[in-house]
Amino acid sequence: MNVSNNAGIDSNDLAKRGESLIRKSTNRYLTTVRIAFRAKQRRFDDFDGLLEESTIKPVQRSIIELSDEQDQPDLLPG
């Protein structure tokens, strides 16, 4: 993850990750819904104080997480 500004990550890296998620998916709509659902979960986790304070927005974090899960499935538990 490349840090480029105070707000979080490199926008080019984020765009490439998002494009990769969409390109590798069989259903663009479901991928978009997964990103939105994960972002909503992260937002509530942040609100409840369960996660450390982050400068990365929930949608950005969800794209990064889903991209990492897609690219490196061996990192997933189970």
From Swiss-Prot:
Q: What is its EC number?
A: 2.7.7.6
Q: Which residues lie in coiled coils?
A: none
**One annotated Gene Ontology cellular component of this protein:** DNA-directed RNA polymerase complex
Query: GO molecular function terms here?
Result: DNA binding; DNA-directed RNA polymerase activity
Sorted alphabetically, which NCBIfam families does this protein's record hold?
Answer: PRK00392.2-5
> Its function?
Promotes RNA polymerase assembly. Latches the N- and C-terminal regions of the beta' subunit thereby facilitating its interaction with the beta and alpha subunits.
What the record says about family reads:
Belongs to the RNA polymerase subunit omega family.
- State the HAMAP family in the record: RNApol_bact_RpoZ
- The protein here is known as DNA-directed RNA polymerase subunit omega
